[in-house]
Amino acid sequence: MSSSRPVFRSRWLPYLLVAPQLIITVIFFIWPAGEALWYSLQSVDPFGFSSQFVGLDNFVTLFHDSYYLDAFWTTIKFSTFVTVSGLLVSLFFAALVEYIVRGSRFYQTLMLLPYAVAPAVAAVLWIFLFNPGRGLITHFLAEFGYDWNHAQNSGQAMFLVVFASVWKQISYNFLFFYAALQSIPRSLIEAAAIDGAGPIRRFFKIALPLIAPVSFFLLVVNLVYAFFDTFPVIDAATSGGPVQATTTLIYKIYREGFTGLDLASSAAQSVVLMFLVIVLTVVQFRYVESKVRYQ
């Protein structure tokens, strides 16, 4: 029986092939994570010239800080809104293209445009549209008697950053959902149609279970996106306000580490955020992935 395992002429070639990825991982993940863990156990002066070992004192102080706990729950709420809304909206548009306006190249191109926009630019775009004094959308809302001012209303500020973040991520999710729907064998869809199943029933009974692995992958990706990659949106749109209503953990880390120069506290917050994302990812892979396997 022949083995399908590749054979290299040189024993060092496999190591050379994986070396670039290992170097990148060490430099951009393991090293910074180690530095953050070391600083989280120290009391560091604002300029980082001297430090003193304090053990877990930074973490104890952290979880007794009401502002940090508020940011923690804001992050959970914000990430849930962005992840769930982004997946549902993207799946809806992908199904719309596949089952209703299939073949519309213009529509598909239009759906991919937000992916080419930088997160900060996306935030600025929606700030212009939601500007309390001159925004097109706020003018439209005013016609119905709704007063919009996200600089003073915490609920409106949260809606703005969630909306901008979801809009920025729609293209990415749409691309994967649309490709997954396209990969479903046409024979299954045609057989269901012959049996009298309508478009909605075909989608929920056939398409949705078959694209479950892609949905799980996007769930993990969108969760990480909401935790980390939405920082430019929040910074450009609300700067964490009003009254820290949109201050997430990643934004609080930036503000205390780079603005307040509290290196020890920001490092401790980074470690907590890192372990939180790792735990959530492991839980998803353990308990969610097992439910999306199909023959």
Swiss-Prot record:
InterPro entries: MetI-like, MetI-like_sf, UgpAE/MalFG_permease. Residues 76-284 form the ABC transmembrane type-1 domain. It is found in: Cell inner membrane. Residues 33-80, 131-156, 229-262 are periplasmic. The chain crosses the membrane at residues 12-32, 81-101, 110-130, 157-177, 208-228, 263-283. GO terms for cellular component: plasma membrane. Belongs to the binding-protein-dependent transport system permease family. UgpAE subfamily. Part of the ABC transporter complex UgpBAEC involved in sn-glycerol-3-phosphate (G3P) import. Probably responsible for the translocation of the substrate across the membrane. The complex is composed of two ATP-binding proteins (UgpC), two transmembrane proteins (UgpA and UgpE) and a solute-binding protein (UgpB). This is sn-glycerol-3-phosphate transport system permease protein UgpA. The gene is ugpA.
